[in-house]
C-alpha cells in the first residue's frame, strides 16, 4: 500500500472510532434518561409495554434454569430465544439491574453502527460506509431503541452480520476456490439462522435476499446451486437445536414460534385497525382449551377466513398498516410529544429521500440495491398482513442508510464541483 493510501486508511479508522464513540455516548445518555423516566411512579420496565416484560421474564427463567415458557397455561414456543438469551447474559452478570442491561444493549447498538460501516465499505467504499455509520450513530430512533428492552437493535445487529456475509459471498473478489466459497455460503446461512432466532421473519426474508443475491452474482448455474444448498444447510444447522427442542415440547416440528397465528389474526380480524390489539387472546381463552400448536393453527384459520370473506376490509387494513409502517413519526402513544415527533421526522425524511436518490444512482448495481433495500421492502410486504409500525421498519433502516449515504456523497461531490 502506498503512503497516501495508508494515511487515508488511518484517517478513516480514526473517523470510524470517533463515530462509534459518539454513538456509544449518545446511547448511554439515553439509557440514563430512559431509566429515570421508567422509574417514575408507576414504575415500569419499558416505555413500550407488552413485549419487554415477556422477554425479561423468559430471561429470568433461563438464568434460573427453568422452563423457557411464560403465562398460564405455559406457552413454550411464544418467542424465539435470541433476545432472551442476551438478556439472560446480562442478568447472570449484573442481576436484575435493568440499567446495566440498557448499557449492554447500548454497546450492541453501537456495534450495529460499526457493522453498517462495514456493509457500506463492502458494497461501495470506506467513505460511504462512514457516512452511513454517522447517520446510524446519531439517528434518534436507532439510538432510542438501542436502550429499550426490545429486540429491534439486536435484530438489526444480526441482520447486518448476515447481509455482510451474503455480500462477501457473491461480490467479485478474486476468490475462485470452490471450498472457500461454499464455506462462506455455510456461514451466511448460519448467520441468517442466528438472526431468525432473534426475529422469526428473517427466516423468509433473509433466505429470499440471499437467494436473489446468489442468482445475481457471478458463477455457473451449478456453482450457484451449490451456494444455495450450502446456505440452506447453514440455516438448518443453526436452527436445528431450537427446532428439535420445539419438537420435543410440542410434538410438532416448529422452526420459529407458535405465535404467528395470533399475530396474523391481530392484523386480520373484525376489530382490526392496523395497530396491534391482542386483547382477544385473553377474551377468547383458547389457550385454556387447546394446545399451543392448536391455538396457533386456529387463529391462522380465523385470519384467513376473515380475509376471504372481507376482501375490501383487508385492502383497507393493508393501506392503514402501510401508513403506519412508512410513517415519518412515531406511532406509539408513548411518543406523541410534538418535539419528539419533529426530531424523528427531521431524521427519517432525509434518510428516505437520500435513499431514493441513492437507488437512482445505483440502478445498474442490482446487488447493492438488493442488499440495502431488500429487507425494507420485504418487511413492508409482510406488514400488508401483519400489523404495521415504524418500529418494524427500524432494523431495515440500517442497511438502507448505506444507500442513503450513496446519495449524500454524490450530492457533496456535486456541490464541491459547483464551488
Per-region residue spans from a language model:
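Membrane-proximal lumenal/periplasmic loop motifs of glycosylation machinery
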Residues: 40-53, 57, 64-84, 92-93, ...
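Transmembrane-helix motifs of polytopic, lipid-linked glycan transferases
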Residues: 103-124, 157, 161-165, 353-357
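Membrane-interface anchor segments at the N-terminal boundary of transmembrane helices
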Residues: 100, 306-372, 382
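Short helix- or helix-capping micro-motifs
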Residues: 23-26, 132-140, 144, 164, ...
Amino acid at each position: 500500500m502506498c503512503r497516501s493510501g495508508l494515511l487515508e486508511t488511518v484517517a478513516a479508522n480514526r473517523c470510524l472510532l470517533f463515530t462509534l464513540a459518539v454513538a456509544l455516548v449518545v446511547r448511554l445518555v439515553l439509557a440514563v434518561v430512559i431509566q429515570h423516566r421508567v422509574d417514575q411512579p408507576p414504575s415500569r420496565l419499558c416505555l413500550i409495554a407488552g413485549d419487554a416484560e415477556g422477554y425479561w421474564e423468559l430471561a429470568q427463567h433461563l438464568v434460573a434454569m427453568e422452563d423457557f415458557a411464560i403465562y398460564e397455561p405455559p406457552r413454550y414456543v411464544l418467542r424465539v430465544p435470541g433476545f432472551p438469551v442476551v438478556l439472560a447474559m446480562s442478568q447472570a452478570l449484573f442481576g436484575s439491574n435493568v440499567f446495566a442491561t440498557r448499557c449492554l444493549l447500548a454497546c450492541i447498538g453501537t456495534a450495529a453502527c460499526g457493522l453498517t460501516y462495514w456493509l457500506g465499505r463492502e458494497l461501495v467504499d470506506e467513505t460511504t460506509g462512514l457516512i452511513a455509520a454517522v447517520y446510524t450513530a446519531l439517528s434518534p430512533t436507532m439510538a432510542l431503541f438501542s436502550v429499550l428492552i426490545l429486540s429491534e437493535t439486536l435484530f438489526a445487529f444480526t441482520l447486518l452480520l448476515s447481509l455482510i456475509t451474503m455480500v462477501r459471498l457473491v461480490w467479485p473478489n478474486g476468490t475462485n476456490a470452490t471450498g472457500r466459497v461454499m464455506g462462506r455460503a455455510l456461514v451466511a446461512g448460519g448467520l441468517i439462522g442466528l438472526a431468525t432466532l432473534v426475529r422469526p421473519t428473517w427466516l423468509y426474508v433473509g433466505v429470499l435476499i440471499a437467494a436473489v443475491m446468489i442468482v445475481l452474482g457471478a458463477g455457473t448455474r451449478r456453482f450457484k446451486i451449490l451456494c444455495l444448498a450450502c446456505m440452506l444447510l447453514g440455516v438448518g444447522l443453526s436452527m436445528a437445536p431450537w427446532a428439535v427442542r420445539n419438537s420435543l415440547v410440542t410434538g410438532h416440528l416448529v422452526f420459529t414460534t407458535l405465535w404467528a397465528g395470533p399475530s396474523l389474526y391481530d392484523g386480520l380480524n373484525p376489530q382490526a385497525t392496523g395497530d396491534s390489539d391482542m386483547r382477544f387472546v385473553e377474551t377468547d381463552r383458547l389457550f385454556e382449551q387447546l394446545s399451543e400448536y392448536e391455538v396457533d393453527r386456529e387463529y391462522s384459520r380465523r385470519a384467513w377466513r376473515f380475509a376471504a370473506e372481507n376482501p375490501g376490509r383487508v385492502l383497507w387494513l393493508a393501506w392503514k398498516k402501510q401508513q403506519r409502517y412508512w410513517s415519518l413519526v412515531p406511532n406509539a402513544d408513548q411518543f406523541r410529544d410534538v418535539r419528539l415527533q419533529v426530531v424523528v421526522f427531521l431524521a427519517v425524511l432525509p434518510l428516505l429521500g437520500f435513499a431514493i436518490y441513492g437507488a437512482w444512482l445505483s440502478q445498474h448495481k442490482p446487488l447493492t440495491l438488493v442488499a440495502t433495500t431488500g429487507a425494507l421492502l420485504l418487511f413492508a410486504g409482510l406488514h400488508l398482513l401483519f400489523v404495521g409500525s415504524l418500529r418494524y421498519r427500524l432494523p431495515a433502516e440500517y442497511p438502507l442508510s448505506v444507500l442513503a449515504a450513496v446519495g449524500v456523497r454524490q450530492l457533496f461531490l456535486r456541490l464541491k464541483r459547483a464551488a
